[in-house]
Each structure stands twice: as structure tokens, then as C-alpha cells.
Amino acid sequence: MQRRNFLKHTAMAGVMLPQFLNGYSVRAMAQSSLMPAIGHDIPNDRVLVLIQLVGGNDGLNTVIPVDQYGAYQAARPNIALPQTKILKLNGFDATALHPALSDIQQLFNDGKAGIVQSVSYPKPNFSHFRATDIWMTGSDSDKILNTGWAGRYLNDSFPGFPEKYPTQTMPDPLAIQIGSVIASAFQGPAFPMGLAISNPASFYDLVEDKTETTPNTRWGDQLAYLEKVSQKTDQYAGVIKKAAQSITRQSDKYPAPGKNPLADQLKIVARLVAGGLRTKVYLVSTGSFDTHAKQAEPDDTTTGNHAQLLRRVSEAVGAFMDDLKGLNAADRVMGMTFSEFGRRIKSNASGGTDHGAAAPIFYFGNGVKAGIIGTNPQLPTSATANDNIAMQHDFRSVYATVLQQWLNLPATDIQTVLMGQFPLLPMV
């Protein structure tokens, strides 16, 4: 294959230019003057998988407060789920799941998944763009950061990247995102700390040795130049391909390709993890959670747009976990969902919900402590359009927990990475 085709997108001096390697999309690492590597050793082979629910997921129809069902139903007369249809959770009679979440229910009841209730931050922002930026960078609501929380973690754990990498102890990309543009979560002090694979088709083009010709345009000239400063990124094409080609059989629980884009992304992640990549953090995403209208079907609220979105997540996570088990890689992986915000307590007249504050997140893996962290949100007896779910847990407590207790970031480094100290949660 033509290695020079590995780059499709690269950020250099703030400019994005197209590059070509079988459709791969990547932010290349420009030269910098970082301190040299100091013999850093990989603390463990654990992997964190982040699942972004883009648009603001409705937490109250995802995790239902059964103990307040009357208030829940009164606040949402046009979208409330029937109490006879919601999914029970072993040992937690006061809480249930949306009927579309059967795979996540099974993981929970098997002791391999948990819920953190009412996750948000002080003074929540209701803009999609700003709220997403807050979650990606790990900032306060009134502070702008130009680095991502995962980027700071990777920069702290792998000093000297990219100049001193790959190394014998870390020969692989530090982070991988399935998406055309690297997320701000992976932004380091000087450059992105990970690679972005544009889409599943691009991934399989690489694995199957499909090639493209360098275009005879001004972009081709820029390609030749950028290759010289992106040789380290180019090296990663080989290790990604080697890892992927070592896995020839995966779970049959995945939907057919194209039927569930999130499942397609997680299938790639499973293949790379099981193939031996030491990449620490993966990011995948699925969208359309901005359910202002027609969130549920009026004649059957267990169906409709939100149900389809949640089913997509549940089926993808279920297949992913089944795949990891079959590939003997499940013990290495912890996953979690997140969304930029939740929705209001009261549904609107359009059969939807408007931008809100706190919402639950799911976490899963063989090594997690299953259960529910926190209590059901307290619902008013007569909700108004302005009522929000109150925060119980700062989202940076979730980050601190997975960084310190799953990825083994020293407690002394949490302040540097998260710009503060946050209580740990019993997730691991």
C-alpha cells in the first residue's frame, strides 16, 4: 500500500489540509519543543472507550424514577413510558430503564454496567456548542480552555509526544477517534494527541490494501511537504493495519454494516483492542439526541425517535461487549456514555423535551462496580417548563475516577489534568 496516503486531514499551524491514505482522516502532529521522554512506562494495558450521545440525551426517559412515577407521568403526559413496559434492574426496584435498553439492562443485571445519576456541573450551559466544549475540555462553565481533558491526560502520561514516539513501550497511537475531525477532548498543549479515522469504510480500505493515487493538484504538492513532518503519523498506519488484520472473526451480534453506525464504530474499536493496540482512549459518537419534537409516538411512547436512538446505543454496546468477550479482551476495556446536557423535566407541546441540565450516564465493563451511584432525581409535583434535573455529581468526578482508578493516573496528577480536585465515585 502507499504509506503516503495515510494522511487525509492534518492540522498544522492551525490550518487543515486534505491528505490521502485510503480515506483515512487524521490530525498529524507538528514539530514542537516539548521536553524529551523520560523513560515513561505504560502503567497498564487498560483502555477507555468514550461514547458521545450528540444533541443532549433525555435522561428522564432513559433512566426512569419508578418511585416517583406519578410525578414523572404528570410532567410528561405525552411522552411518559408505561410503567408496565419499563425494564427492571436487579436490586433497584425504584429505578428502571427505557424498554429499548434491553442489552444495557442485561449488562447491568449481570454486574457489568452501572449508572451515575444526575451528572452535570455548576451553572450549566444550554448551548450545544458551548456545553459540548465544556464536557470535552473539562472546564468550568465560565472558563474557556484550549486543551482537552483526555489530551492533558495523555500529555501528562506520555511526555515528549510526538517527537519521542513511537517507542518500544508505546508503539501505537495514544488515542483514536472514529470521526472526520479530531475532538477537542484530545487536544494537547501544542497539538492533538490522537488520530481520527474518518469512517468505517476508510478503516476497511486500509485493512484491505486499497490504494489511492496522490492527486496531481496543489494538494499533491502540499502532501509531499506534509509527509516530511508527519512521518510519525505515517508509522501508525502500519501498526493499525497489523492489529486489524490479526483479527479475522468477530461477534455475530453486530447489526449488518450500515444499519447501526455506532455499532460499526465499536466493531472497529474491538478489533483494534483485541489486535493488540496499546491505544489508551477511543472516542465514538452517535447523534440526533436533540429531541425537541416527536420524541415518542403518541399511540405508543415506547416507540419513536428517542426509542430508536437508545436502541442503537444499547445494541451497539451489547454487541461490543459480546465481541470483546469472544476476543478475550473484555477485561481490558471500560466504556462510558456522555452527552452535552440532559432535557427539562416537563415535556413540551410538540411531544419532545427542551435543553436541560443534569442527566445520567452509563458505564460498563468486566472490571466496573455495577449499580446506581446517586439517587433518583427529585421531581416536583407540578413541573413547569423551567424545571431542571438538579446536579448530584460533577462530570469531572467521573473523569477523575476513570483516570485515577481505571487508567492509573497518579492522584497527584489529577490537579494538573482536571484543573482541580473532584470526589471519586465508586465506579471501579
Where are the language model's segments positioned?
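Acidic/histidine-rich, metal-coordinating catalytic segments
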Residues: M334-G342
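Feature for exported/extracytoplasmic and membrane-associated proteins, marking the mature portion
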Residues: M1-E315, A319-L327, K346, P360-V428
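Alpha-helical scaffolds flanking conserved acidic
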Residues: V47, R332-V333
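Basic/polar, cationic surfaces and motifs that engage anionic cell-wall
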Residues: R343-S350
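C-terminal, helix-dominated tail/subdomain
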Residues: S350-I361
